[in-house]
Swiss-Prot record:
UniProt GO molecular function: rRNA (guanine-N7-)-methyltransferase activity
Keyword entries, A-Z: Cytoplasm, Methyltransferase, rRNA processing, S-adenosyl-L-methionine, Transferase
Protein name: Ribosomal RNA small subunit methyltransferase G
GO cellular component labels: cytosol
Recorded superkingdom: Bacteria
């Protein structure tokens, strides 16, 4: 049994916040009702306790989160059911990657979607000289959201509205760390990450409860020495850390995979 299989297990942690709203009186029935925020202050506090950030970074994250909630009403950026746990489930889940690559300045985030982890990392690294986060997203609406998120937060994110393969082929310069979250099967992700890892990048790939099955399948096509990190946010999340990716005889074709 491989080391990563021995290390595989589950962490469960529930983070919830409850709030009591006082009765406002009968005349409140006639007043326009303001939309209630789907976010939880307790969830934010729990996330920042897990992954502390500076006040400047927190302010940038607040601006990003507000924008995401606005856009979520018209563009499906994340599962709406996860909004009450947005800070722990998405923000903290992204921030924890920084501890695994503390010296990395140039990042490439494949399939950035709603900005996890790419925009979150950009918010955290905005004050680091020379930092740059490439956000690769071919969906036009999501790329437009990412562009606006980078603009209002003033972060060092660069939007690449193209397929991942095209980005890798055109890449100029060295990447320190490549990331992907909720994107594609591991054996496919390795094909995209391989050229960057061969040039010295570290791969940090966020996976869910099926990580063991994905690793088993991936090792049919790739020689890898993965290190598994259970998510600091609890639940069934895992981070697959890789410093080496080598092809076997029959790697899966990237063309066989199409992102929804």
């Amino acid at each position: 049994m491989a080391d990563w299989q021995k290390a595989h297990g589950r962490l469960q942690r529930d983070v919830a916040g409850n709030r009591t709203v006082p009765y406002a009186g009968a005349d409140a029935m006639t007043r326009p009702r303001q939309a209630q925020s789907p976010l939880s202050a307790a969830d934010k506090a729990a996330a920042l306790a897990l992954t502390p950030v500076s006040r400047e970074t927190e302010a940038r994250l607040d601006a990003y989160v507000d924008l995401l909630v606005q856009w979520q009403t018209k563009t499906n950026l994340i599962a709406s059911s996860t909004l009450p746990q947005l800070w722990t489930r998405h923000i903290a889940d992204s921030l924890q990657l920084l501890a695994l690559a503390p010296q990395a300045k140039r990042w490439a985030d494949f399939g950035s979607g709603g900005g996890f982890p790419g925009v979150v990392l950009a918010c955290a690294l905005a004050d680091v000289e020379g930092a740059r986060i490439d956000l690769v997203e071919r969906n036009a609406k999501k790329a437009a959201f990412l562009r606006e998120a980078v603009r209002i937060t003033g972060t060092p994110g660069v939007i690449h509205p193209m397929d991942i393969g095209d980005y890798v082929d055109r890449l100029d310069g060295r990447i320190d760390c490549v990331t992907a979250r909720a994107l594609a099967p591991l054996q496919v992700l390795l094909g995209f990450a391989e050229p960057l890892v061969k040039q010295g990048a570290k791969a940090l790939l966020l996976k869910g409860q099926d990580v063991e099955a994905e690793l088993t399948e991936a090792t049919k096509y790739w020689n890898i020495e993965p290190r598994l990190h259970s998510s600091r946010t609890g639940g069934q999340g895992w981070i697959v850390e890789l410093d080496r990716i080598e092809r076997r005889d029959r790697p899966p074709t990237k063309q066989a995979w199409r992102r929804a």
